């Protein structure tokens, strides 16, 4: 017959909670967690977790993990890296000095060529430029400056 209560609710008020008398349902008989993986739990670790212990291969000292780190930004997002005021001033005075956008200061290394640039010259500083990006920047009368 199904019961309305879970077993734990039924056992409320019974001191041992179904685990016998003194010290029968003991604390951590095999140790806590992964204890004894190389000793009393060896069979389990060998069977179900082969290769858990030990080392393989050689260590690479002074390994540079982020050699290929190169965050990119597209041309259509280029003007979002400078303030609104700079953008407005550059649009107003067409013959004046071209604004400088340093993408490295904004955390990007490479400029990619997706999107269109407004028809006003701009000087872009970056570590890398894609071919299309360089063509488009020079197409609006701007310049690409490589920085280390």
UniProtKB/Swiss-Prot annotation:
Question: Region (Disordered) spans which residues?
Answer: 1-37
Q: What's in the keyword line of the UniProt record?
A: Acetylation, Cytoplasm, Hydroxylation, Phosphoprotein, Ribonucleoprotein, Ribosomal protein
Q: Which residues carry this modification: Phosphoserine?
A: 68
Q: Could you name the domain of life of the organism this protein comes from?
A: Eukaryota
Q: Name one GO biological process term.
A: translation
- UniProt xrefs under PROSITE patterns: RIBOSOMAL_L15
* InterPro entries referenced in this protein's UniProt entry, alphabetically: Rbsml_uL15_N (IPR027386), Ribosomal_uL15 (IPR030878), Ribosomal_uL15/eL18 (IPR021131), Ribosomal_uL15/eL18_sf (IPR036227), Ribosomal_uL15_CS (IPR001196)
Q: Which residues carry this modification: (3S)-3-hydroxyhistidine?
A: 39
PTM annotation (N6-acetyllysine): residues: 47, 55, 110
Query: What GO cellular component term, any one, is given?
Result: cytosolic ribosome
Q: Where is the composition biased (Basic residues)?
A: 1-30
Chief location category: cytoplasm
GO MF annotations, alphabetized: structural constituent of ribosome
Per UniProt, subunit arrangement is:
Component of the large ribosomal subunit.
Q: Its biological function?
A: Component of the large ribosomal subunit. The ribosome is a large ribonucleoprotein complex responsible for the synthesis of proteins in the cell.
The Swiss-Prot or TrEMBL record describes its family as follows: Belongs to the universal ribosomal protein uL15 family.
Tell me which PANTHER family the record gives. 60S RIBOSOMAL PROTEIN L27A (PTHR11721), LARGE RIBOSOMAL SUBUNIT PROTEIN UL15 (PTHR11721:SF3)
Q: What's the protein here called?
A: Large ribosomal subunit protein uL15
Organism (species)? Mus musculus
- The gene name on file is Rpl27a
